[in-house]
Structure formats: structure tokens, C-alpha cells
């Protein structure tokens, strides 16, 4: 069938066909890093019910690869439905996401070698650091994840998409109703593209800010860097005190991700 319209809005996500067909460029890098995710069911109440959270970061040698360098458990339905994730080395090609390997990985993250899990789905998620410098061409306008592609760090995605939608919607309404000329629509890219670029930079910086945390949890000179680094955090001497002070500073840096109010309000 055919639909005729005066304007078209492409808000079709990070794999936008509208962006592709329109030929709008992206600046930055797509798929600069990768994470394996598994959606699974298991009763973890004995490990989590007394310390409830939505996210659990797990420091272990089995999940020490990548910028974050930690495994993650995300509670979907406490305390039986979960998403587990760990960094991937993209240079090694497609990862092994067989049931046996995924079960082994989840058990290592949880720390329970006999944990029974039911795997629902597995997937690979890629970290993007890219934005469109221009959001429109002619009578076609793009917005949302189509024009700013970034990780969820700092929780900036939904707010930014809503900001795009609000900015474009009232302008389209004014033009269509005859309250303003079409020149008003030129301001959409001018106002929103800088916000998209800023959000992409901030979200990716929030991932990079895990670097100082990783250093606190690791001793590069040891056979097991993570085990040795964690042990040194409890050292009663000067070295342990210095490592704990560095950890406090590294945790404070994460305020920009979890508690800051700023760029997400643009």
C-alpha cells in the first residue's frame, strides 16, 4: 500500500532504515565494544534478598575484560528473573553462547558452581559512540536513537528521545496548522544535534570512568590480578589504606553516572 504525507518522521531506532535511506551521516564509531547478555531464570534470593538492588556489579577474574571489567546481574523480577552480562573480546570473533558455556559463565558470576538456571535468550550488544550532525533532509526528520547512538550509562537515552520528540512535534504542529512558516523546522537540527552529541560523549565517558575502579580491584603483577587486588583492599598497612582511598575517589567519580542532574535535562 502507499501512504502519502507532507512530512515523515524517522524515529525507528539505532538501526534506522530511514536514516540509511535518507543518507544522513553519522559521526563517531559504531560497535566499538561488545557485551554478551543472557536472560535467565534462577532463584538468587539467598544471595540478594538481604541486599536488594536492581544492578549487581561482580568483580571476578572470569569477567575482567573490557572497559567496565566487571560482570553484571540486572534484576528483572526479584529474585528469579535476571539478565547477566560480561565483556567480549571482539578480536576473537563470535563468542560461544551455547547453553553449557552460558551456564558456566553465570555460575562463575554468581559464585555458585551448582546453580540451576533456565536460559531464555542470549544476545550480543554493541557499544556505539556515534551521532548525526544533521537530523533532517528536506521533509524528512529523524530523532531518538536513530540520531544519537550510545550505551545506557547515565540513563540518558529516554530523556533525550523525548526531548527530540517534543522539540519536533510542536514545530510540525505549528507549521501544519499555519501558525509558522517551514523555516521554523530548520531549528530542529540546530537545537537538538548539539544535545545528541553531548549525550553520546557523556554516556561513553561514564563507561570509561570505570577504569579507575578496575585499577583498585586489580594487581597486575599477580598471577590472579583480581584476587590479589581484592585482598590488598583489606590490607591493614599503608598500601591497603592507599588502595581504599583510591577506591573512594573512583566511586565518587561514578556520581556523574548515577546521581548527577545535568546533561539528561537538555
Describe each model-derived feature in a short phrase:
Residues 1-7:
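Core beta-strand elements of the Rossmann-like FAD/NAD(P) dinucleotide-binding domain
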Residues 3, 114, 138:
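Structured loop/turn residues at beta-strand edges in well-structured enzyme cores
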Residues 7-127:
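Conserved FAD-binding catalytic core of PHBH/FMO-like flavoproteins
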Residues 10, 119, 125-205:
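Conserved mid-domain beta->alpha element of the FAD-binding
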Residues 18-19, 48, 150-151, 197, ...:
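Short helix/loop capping segments that flank catalytic or ligand/cofactor-binding pockets
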Residues 88-92, 156, 206:
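Conserved short loop/turn motifs at secondary-structure junctions
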Residues 92-96, 158, 178, 237:
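Hydrophobic alpha-helical scaffolding
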Residues 104, 108, 174-266:
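Helical substrate-recognition/capping region of FAD-dependent monooxygenase/halogenase enzymes
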Amino acid at each position: 500500500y502507499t501512504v502519502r504525507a507532507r512530512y515523515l518522521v524517522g524515529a525507528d531506532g539505532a538501526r534506522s532504515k530511514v536514516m540509511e535511506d535518507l543518507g544522513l551521516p553519522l559521526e563517531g564509531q559504531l560497535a566499538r565494544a561488545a557485551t554478551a547478555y543472557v536472560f535467565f531464570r534462577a532463584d538468587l534470593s539467598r544471595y540478594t534478598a538481604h541486599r536488594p538492588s536492581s544492578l549487581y556489579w561482580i568483580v571476578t577474574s572470569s569477567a575482567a575484560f573490557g572497559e567496565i571489567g566487571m560482570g553484571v546481574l540486572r534484576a528483572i523480577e526479584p529474585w528469579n528473573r535476571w539478565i547477566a552480562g560480561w565483556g567480549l573480546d571482539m578480536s576473537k570473533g563470535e563468542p560461544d553462547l551455547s547453553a553449557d558455556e552460558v551456564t558456566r559463565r553465570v555460575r562463575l558470576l554468581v559464585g555458585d558452581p551448582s546453580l540451576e538456571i533456565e536460559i531464555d535468550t542470549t544476545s550480543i550488544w554493541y557499544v556505539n559512540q556515534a551521532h548525526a550532525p544533521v537530523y533532517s533532509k528536506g521533509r524528512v526528520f529523524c530523532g531518538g536513537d536513530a540520531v544519537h547512538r550510545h550505551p545506557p550509562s547515565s540513563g540518558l537515552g529516554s530523556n533525550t528521545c523525548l526531548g527530540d520528540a517534543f522539540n519536533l512535534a510542536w514545530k510540525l504542529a505549528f507549521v501544519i496548522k499555519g501558525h509558522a512558516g517551514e523555516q521554523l523546522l530548520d531549528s530542529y537540527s540546530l537545537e537538538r544535534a548539539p544535545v545528541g552529541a553531548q549525550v553520546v560523549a557523556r554516556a561513553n565517558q561514564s563507561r570509561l570512568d570505570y577504569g579507575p575502579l578496575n585499577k583498585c580491584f586489580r594487581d597486575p603483577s599477580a598471577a590472579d590480578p583480581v584476587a590479589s587486588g581484592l585482598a590488598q583492599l583489606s590490607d591493614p598497612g599503608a598500601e591497603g589504606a592507599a588502595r581504599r582511598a583510591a577506591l573512594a575517589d573512583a566511586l565518587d567519580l561514578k556520581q556523574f553516572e548515577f546521581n548527577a542532574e545535568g546533561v539528561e535535562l537538555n
